[in-house]
From Swiss-Prot:
This is Large ribosomal subunit protein uL30. GO terms for biological process: translation. It comes from the Bacteria. Part of the 50S ribosomal subunit. One of its GO terms (molecular function) is structural constituent of ribosome. The gene is rpmD. Signal peptide: none annotated. The keyword Flavoprotein does not apply. The keyword Ion transport does not apply. Belongs to the universal ribosomal protein uL30 family. The lineage of its organism: Bacteria, Bacillati, Bacillota, Bacilli, Bacillales. Keywords: Ribonucleoprotein, Ribosomal protein. GO terms for cellular component: cytosolic large ribosomal subunit.
């Protein structure tokens, strides 16, 4: 499968707990931190929940 790079571009301060947990589950901890993960439906679902906080780049 393809890999995607996810970057946290907006802060989680003041966001609901569910969004904070989703960002943490994606492996993002600090602003502008990035992770490379396999592209699968589970990851895409998590990205959709916090799409306003992250940017996604296909590798």
């Amino acid at each position: 499968m393809a890999k995607i790079q996810i970057t946290l571009t907006r802060s989680i301060i003041g966001r609901p707990e569910t969004q904070r947990k989703t960002v943490k589950a994606l492996g993002l901890t600090k602003m502008h931190s990035s992770v490379e993960v396999e592209d699968n439906p589970a990851i895409r679902g998590q990205i959709n929940k916090v799409s306003h906080l992250v940017t996604v780049k296909e590798l």
